[in-house]
Amino acid sequence: MSSKAEKRKYTYDWPMAALTVDGIVFGFDPNDDINPLKILLIRRAEGPFIGHWAIPGGHVNIGQNEGLEDAVRREVQEETGARFEYLEQLYTFGDPNRDPRGRVISVAYIALVRKADYEAVVGGDDADLAVWYPVNKLGQIKLAFDHRKILSLALKRLQGKIRYAPIGFDLLPSKFTLGQLQQLYEAILQRDLVKSNFRRRILSMGTLIEIGSKAKLKSGRPAKLYQFDKKKYEKAVELGFNFEL
């Protein structure tokens, strides 16, 4: 094949869909006793759905050979300034009518961040505002496209996975109290947990390190601080350990 033929662009004989990514970024605020679980949202500065809230995301740079994970990291950073380590693919959304501009297929990802690292998120690119919004108040706002459906599925995935994997530690400060850990689980699972049972179970796993210092609380005595021992957890998993709560 000649070099000219190799460089020639291939043209399909049928219409092609646009490929996009969406980044559902969860954060946790232990200082918010009412609405501690947050989601990172942007307000759309352009149509369609101008002025509506939306999940950060956008088109994959096909021409630059960009991968899906690279695309979602780039889009979230461009639109909010946030970066993250934990990332997992949620689902592919391809309803023919999900975008009024044409056929758009979106691959959605869940990301977890320590909210304290990104308190001052700023809207950028085609977003005029970025905010941490309480998950339990999403029903009060207008969301663009099929993003309400996407967020609902993302929350269900988070609720399911936190029961058998230690992903919650990607949302907590690196040093945390058992009270903050229980607060996180209750916020995600959306139900109260028995304090004594929760602490007994979590401490029996042997994956927490008591660091020897204490945190001052709003009321009551200072609480012990802990860290998650990831290496010990990974070693325990190799031996058949089950994190299930």
Kindly give the residue locations of the regions a language model identified.
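Short, His- and charge-rich active-site/binding loops that engage polyanionic ligands
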Residues: 35, 39, 43-46, 50-52, ...
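Short helix-coil junctions and helix-kink-helix linkers
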Residues: 183-192
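N-terminal strand-loop-strand
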Residues: 8-54, 69
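Core subunits and conserved enzymes of cellular information-processing
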Residues: 1, 28-42, 69-80, 223, ...
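Short Pro/Gly-enriched beta-strand edge/turn motifs at strand-loop
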Residues: 2-8
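Active-site segment of metal-dependent pyrophosphate-handling enzymes
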Residues: 17-19, 35, 62, 68-73, ...
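NUDIX/MutT-family hydrolases
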Residues: 110, 121-158, 171-179, 197-207, ...
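Long, intrinsically disordered, low-complexity Ser/Thr/Pro-rich regulatory/activation regions
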Residues: 210-245
